[in-house]
């Protein structure tokens, strides 16, 4: 006869096996999250200008927010479906970013979803940089919207490589890969940033906690 305590342990193990997902294990437990890629000219200069311009109009009316992401907040505003550029951005994500991420990480593209998209502003008279951090999502992207600044770029802690993007270029990576926004010296740097979930909100954190 199986003892009750053994039965409980077997049930717990079975639950863990049922909940297990190799993608989550790779990203959260095994640290296999160092892959990244840069997609050249995913956005046109005209599209980038439209995002910046609409962001400027929105900020004049609502101001720039500085505390939306806790300890590692940026000066930003969330881009939502009330923005005229939303459909264009959403289409770029679903039709161009999702396939790249799915191929890079060998995952099911249909499980990817948008958690948040936001316009970030770094300026010489405001927030100049963002310290090393991990994003609260499985996958992330950064789109360079302008080049009217000196410095900047994104550095990943594991290899210390500073990735500089041209206008319209998009950096795709795992949000679990620790990275930082490098300090700008002059001007204003605008980026479009996005957090992408895999399998739904908190899907992986539940399975790896």
Identify the role of each PLM range.
Residues 3, 68-71, 121, 189:
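Basic side chains
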Residues 99-209:
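Catalytic core of non-heme Fe(II) oxygenases with the double-stranded beta-helix
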Residues 5-11, 18, 41-42, 88, ...:
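Compositionally biased, intrinsically disordered low-complexity segments
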């Amino acid at each position: 006869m199986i003892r009750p305590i053994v039965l409980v342990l077997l049930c717990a193990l079975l639950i863990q096996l049922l909940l297990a997902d190799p993608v989550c294990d790779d990203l959260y437990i095994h640290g296999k999250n160092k892959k990244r890629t840069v997609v050249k000219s995913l956005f046109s200069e005209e599209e980038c200008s439209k995002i910046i311009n609409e962001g400027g109009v929105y900020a004049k009316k609502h101001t720039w927010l500085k505390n939306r992401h806790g300890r590692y907040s940026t000066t930003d505003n969330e881009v939502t479906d009330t923005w005229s550029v939303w459909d264009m951005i959403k289409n770029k994500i679903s039709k161009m970013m999702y396939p790249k991420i799915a191929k890079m990480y060998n995952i099911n593209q249909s499980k990817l979803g948008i958690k948040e998209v936001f316009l970030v502003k770094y300026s010489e008279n405001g927030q100049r940089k963002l310290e090393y951090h991990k994003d609260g999502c499985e996958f992330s992207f950064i789109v360079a919207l302008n080049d009217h600044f000196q410095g900047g770029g994104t550095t990943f802690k594991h290899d210390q490589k500073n990735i500089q993007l041209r206008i319209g270029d998009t950096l795709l990576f795992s949000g679990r890969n620790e990275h930082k926004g490098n300090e700008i010296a002059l001007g204003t740097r605008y980026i479009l940033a996005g957090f992408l979930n895999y399998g739904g909100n908190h899907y992986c954190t539940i399975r790896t906690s």
